[in-house]
Structures are given as structure tokens and as C-alpha cells.
Amino acid sequence: RLVAKGFLERYDNGIYYIPKAGGLLGKSYLDPLLVIMRKYVRNKYETYGYITGLSFVNQLGLTTQMPAVIEIVTNTEATNGRTVMVGSQKVRIKKSAVPVSNNNVELLQLLDCIVQAEKYTELSLKETVDTMLSYVRQKRFTKEQLSEVSYAINGATAKKLIEWGIIYEFRS
């Protein structure tokens, strides 16, 4: 009824918003990225997912490529992977192997990125490793944080953590 009266606008299934009177276009519209972040990544109080894949590799500066499909790992997904449309944006959602929280989200993002970095990077291996090392130093990850998610680390990730020297940057 509120949609019919014009108080609310329907964005997508189960997603409604209060439109603001805009300038040239009349009404305001929701940014698909904001809807994606709220639905699959975090709200005001908690974090329950993270962006991974080419999007995160781009955020780190390892590539200039922009993905057509945003990959997200989230606690709110029950399947091992599916693709959905949020507005005009395609999103690939995957279930998290480790429950994502405010405490471990950046570390889980890094661990996913380590495996994907060589596939997507436009930099040399040395520049890629240096970028990853500076990210670890900037975030000041601890060995305790790493041990809390260690059961989800696969062999390829563990190998690169050691070979690239990233594991030695974790603080005691």
C-alpha cells in the first residue's frame, strides 16, 4: 500500500526504500553496490561477508580490471555458489568456510586473495608479493588471528603464505 501511495519505492524482491525528491530525474534511485553491501556484506553493527575475487584484487591495486560479476563470500548464503542479479549488477555469492565476523573479515579476504592474486595480477611476482606484504603490515594481523582461521586454509594458500614470506609478517 505504501508503494501504491508513493511513500516507498520497490527496488527488488524484499528491498524497499524511501525515495528522495531529486533534481533532474525526479526521484532518487538506490545504488546497486549499496544494496549488495547491506544484503551480503555488513550492516551498521556486524560484518557477515566480504568482497573477494577480481574486485578485491583491484582494490589492492594488483590489477586495473573491473569485474562484470562481483564475487562475495557471506554467512547469509547456504549454497556453495550461485549468481543473482541485484538491480543491474550480477553478483556471485558463496558460502563461507569460516564464519565471517568483524574480527576476521580482512584476514579471510587476504587468504582468498593470495590464491587468486597470480591469476589476476598485472604486476610482476615481486611487485605482487610486495603489495601483499605491505597490506599485511598495514592491517597488523596477528598469529592468533591466523590460528583462528587456520582450519580453512588449504594447501595452495599455505604454500604461498610461506613461499612469499607473508606468514613471517604476522605479529606475535
Report the location of each language-model feature.
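Hydrophobic alpha-helical interaction segments
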Residues: 94-172
